[in-house]
Amino acid sequence: MPYIELESLDDVRLDVFARLTEAQLRNKLEPEKGIFIVESEKVIDRALLGGVQPLSMLMTPEWVDRTREIVARAEAACEEPGGLPVFVVPSKEAERLTGFAVTRGILLACRRPQLPSMEDLLARVDAEKAARAAAVAAGELDPGEVGNMHDASRRRIAVLEGIVDHTNVGAIFRSAAAMGIDAVLVTPTCCDPL
């Protein structure tokens, strides 16, 4: 899909990036219609690797050439009729639209992934631990690179309750990954991790 240059911020297609509240994006009543916003090429890359469903993209002109590869990947992952709309707005307008400088150049609106059941999550954790253990046993993986291998029969799960600051939730997720935590559960009293 070609890039769509916009001069007016009144375009309703930009609502998802600026005029919808977190609660409206999250859409608790109809979670399958929920949306979350991903910022930066690096985070978009990780989200696409995780299988998210892209809906639309917003960037400023100076990022168009630098992000062609990630835009192509997002377009390839988009299942929306008509493809992935990629909106380009002047930097000052992007700042006015979002309320902050789009310092990482690119925003991607994505469909919220369906959360696994507790049983499915634990089965996935167990399968990943077993696969890592088998790879170490076969000499395909260095034990030092595996992380939480000290006891494959135990699961290490972090539970976040009542964390209301997005920065803290992000820091906890990064720390959990660094410590080899197998899964992170977030209660409804936490702010949205996405």
What residue ranges belong to the model's regions?
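RNA substrate-binding interface of SAM-dependent RNA methyltransferases
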Residues: 4, 42, 49, 76, ...
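Short, glycine/polar-rich helix-capping loops at beta-to-alpha or helix-loop-helix junctions
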Residues: 66-70, 191-194
